[in-house]
Curated annotation (Swiss-Prot):
SUPFAM superfamilies: YccV-like. Transmembrane segments: none annotated. It is found in: Cytoplasm. It comes from Yersinia enterocolitica serotype O:8 / biotype 1B (strain NCTC 13174 / 8081). HAMAP family: HspQ (MF_01194). The keyword Cytoplasm applies. Involved in the degradation of certain denaturated proteins, including DnaA, during heat shock stress. This is Heat shock protein HspQ. The lineage of its organism: Bacteria, Pseudomonadati, Pseudomonadota, Gammaproteobacteria, Enterobacterales. GO terms for cellular component: cytoplasm. GO terms for biological process: response to heat. GO terms for molecular function: DNA binding.
Length: 105
């Protein structure tokens, strides 16, 4: 069983670039097309660790889906980000949906 450091709905930061993101899904290991030789995913250790689907914002504030290795991410301590309120709203919405009971027929 592989344990992940980050959860769905959690805000994270990219270690190298520093951008804020929200985890929307987790893969237990790299699960896209075979990586090119120069890609991060070509590293066996990274490829076999958890990978995260993360939503970030581009320079115009539009959402962008990224796929990042666990080693590329770090925890985000702040709860509010006035410069990127849509990511705060996305994280809160996901967490709420995960906690809300679902009615079934």
């Amino acid at each position: 069983m592989i344990a992940s450091k980050f959860g769905i709905g959690q805000q994270v930061r990219h270690r190298l670039h520093g951008y804020l993101g929200v985890v929307i899904d987790i893969d237990p290991e790299y699960s896209l097309e075979p990586p090119a030789p120069d890609e991060v995913a070509n590293n066996d250790t990274l490829r076999l660790s958890p990978w995260y689907h993360v939503v970030i914002e581009d320079d115009e504030g539009q959402p962008v889906h990224t796929y990042l290795a666990e080693a590329q991410l770090t925890y985000e301590d702040m709860d509010a980000h006035p410069e990127q309120p849509s990511l705060d709203e996305l994280a809160a919405s996901i967490r709420h949906q995960l906690q809300a009971p679902r009615l079934r027929n």
